[in-house]
A protein has these predicted regions:
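An amphipathic, aromatic/His-enriched active-site/gating alpha helix that lines ligand/cofactor pockets
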Residues: 18-42, 54-89
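Accessory recognition modules or surfaces
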Residues: 1, 6-7, 47-60
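Specificity-determining recognition surfaces
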Residues: 92-93
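Surface-exposed interaction/gating patches
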Residues: 2-18, 33
């Protein structure tokens, strides 16, 4: 069974259209490390993007490899500085 992580990014007002193309580039890089996006939604009321990512195997090790990768570093070049906050947590299925 895959491990699932929930992520919520709070974006500066009016900047979601700037952030989403950058976020999609990072998702492409994560997928190269075996991650899969379970869902992703924009909460327009709170200007958040809420998403879940899963990985089979050792999530923490794969995430560390991804975070320290040259692919991720390259994707971060020119990143818009529009995130106000991040919340991250591991998920447990209830239904």
């Amino acid at each position: 069974m895959p491990t699932v992580q929930l992520r919520r990014y709070e974006i500066e007002d009016g900047q979601m259209d700037v952030f989403l193309p950058y976020w999609k580039k990072l998702i492409e890089q994560r997928e190269k490390f075996g991650f899969r996006v379970v869902f992703a939604y924009v909460d327009e009321t709170n200007n958040d993007i809420v998403w879940a990512v899963e990985h089979d195997g050792d999530f923490a090790a794969a995430e560390a490899e991804y975070f320290h990768s040259s692919e991720r570093a390259a994707a971060l070049i020119g990143a818009p500085l529009v995130m106000k906050g991040i919340k991250v947590g591991m998920a447990s299925r209830v239904v």
